[in-house]
């Protein structure tokens, strides 16, 4: 699996990021647990974010790596679990949106996702669904899709390192 590293520096947060936080971003695993476990072992993240499809994979991963917090949302293939389709978290003063992306129609446009992020003061919007890795920045908002860590010849995930600017 390809691992893409993105160090994102946020200046002007009102306080300095004292400790570099390493986030492993996974999406669209579709029951492929072992590549995720290997990515965790390689990356050694502080947090794991799973962006849906399938949410049960995130639960199984959390059981395997109990020392690392796993935050997840549901996606378009999580028919039996619609518990949390999106969530917002704040780490070191950076507000982060986690979603699968299908409700924002990310296969055709990123505008609804960008507008939701802007409206909610989000600096980092994480989404999946397209199975294609993407990194875009607009007006201080970073949009990131890690790609699919599931059944693909081009399986990928992303690592985000939060640092102060």
Which stretches of residues belong to each language-model region?
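Binuclear metal-dependent phosphoesterase catalytic core
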Residues: 2-5, 10-21, 35, 42, ...
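Residue-level detector of beta-strand structural context in well-folded domains
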Residues: 86-87, 133, 158
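Active-site environment of divalent metal-dependent phosphoester hydrolases
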Residues: 30-34, 55-59, 77-82, 104-109, ...
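Glycine/small-residue-rich loop that forms an oxyanion/phosphate-binding "nest" at active or ligand-binding sites
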Residues: 71, 77, 83-99, 105-120
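Core catalytic region of metal-dependent phosphoesterases/phosphodiesterases
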Residues: 7-10, 15, 21-91
């Amino acid at each position: 699996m390809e691992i893409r590293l993105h160090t994102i520096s946020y200046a002007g947060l009102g306080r300095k990021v004292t400790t570099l936080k390493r986030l492993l971003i996974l999406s669209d695993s579709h029951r492929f647990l072992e590549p995720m476990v290997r990515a965790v072992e390689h990356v050694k993240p502080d947090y794991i974010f799973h962006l849906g499809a399938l949410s049960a994979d995130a639960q199984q991963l959390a059981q395997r790596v109990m020392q690392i917090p796993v935050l997840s949302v549901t996606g378009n293939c999580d028919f039996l679990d619609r518990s949390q389709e999106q969530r917002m978290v704040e780490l070191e003063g950076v507000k982060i949106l986690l979603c699968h992306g299908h409700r924002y129609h990310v296969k055709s446009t990123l505008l609804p996702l960008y507008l939701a992020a802007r409206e909610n003061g989000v600096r980092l919007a994480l989404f999946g669904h397209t199975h294609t890795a993407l990194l875009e920045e607009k007006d201080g908002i970073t949009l990131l899709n890690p790609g699919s860590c599931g059944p693909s010849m081009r399986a990928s995930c992303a690592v985000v390192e939060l640092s102060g600017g």
